[in-house]
């Protein structure tokens, strides 16, 4: 078994990205220009609600657009893996904050996806939101995954496990969805680097 040392580096992390076997780039916070606050967008609904109300004029789609702009900025840094590209949807299962099918939402998400493609990022298919009961679908949403396949992008399946019992949760279903989206293979991280595995 290969044991590697990596870091999930957030846009607002103080940690350096160098010195690891790999790094995952991700966004977990939005910075409010009005209040100066940093809001964690994937932890508590009240935090996301306050972010939208106090710093985005009550416009949830504006918050989503800001999130995807931040993802594009992280993608431009060239992480080995771009993590949970649409994490902003985590607390939005019932559509309380924004419409995930709205043209503005989809355009913003596509902007982040195009930035990931331009930077040559490997896109994470992440099962963690389903495992922890927040979502019924993985990150990214199916339509984004299909768009990524059409771009010729590559994916890696991860569980984003915060506990041992979630280490390989949903891998078989994720592989089925990846294949249905148009991919013939996934990337697997080994001691020798990323390797292609057919599905």
State what each model feature region is:
Residues 1-118:
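Extended substrate/RNA-proximal surfaces in nucleic-acid metabolism proteins
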Residues 95-199:
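Charged catalytic cores and adjacent phosphate/nucleic-acid-binding surfaces used
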């Amino acid at each position: 078994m290969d044991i590697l040392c990596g870091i999930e580096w957030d846009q607002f992390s103080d940690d350096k990205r160098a010195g690891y076997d790999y790094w995952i780039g991700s966004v977990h916070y939005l910075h409010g220009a009005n209040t100066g606050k940093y809001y964690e967008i994937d932890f508590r609904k009240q935090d996301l609600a306050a972010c939208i109300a106090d710093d985005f004029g009550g416009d949830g789609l504006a918050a989503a657009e800001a999130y995807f702009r931040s993802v594009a900025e992280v993608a431009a840094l060239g992480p080995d893996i771009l993590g949970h590209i649409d994490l902003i949807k985590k607390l939005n299962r019932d559509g309380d904050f924004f419409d995930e099918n709205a043209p503005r939402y989809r355009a913003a998400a596509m902007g982040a996806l195009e930035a990931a493609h331009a930077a040559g990022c490997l896109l994470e298919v992440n099962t963690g939101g389903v495992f922890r009961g927040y979502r019924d679908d993985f990150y990214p949403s199916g339509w984004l995954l299909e768009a990524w396949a059409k771009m010729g992008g590559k994916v890696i399946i991860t569980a984003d496990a915060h506990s041992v019992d979630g280490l390989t949760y949903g891998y078989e279903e994720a592989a089925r969805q990846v294949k249905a989206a148009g991919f013939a293979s996934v990337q697997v991280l080994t001691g020798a680097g990323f390797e292609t595995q057919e599905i």
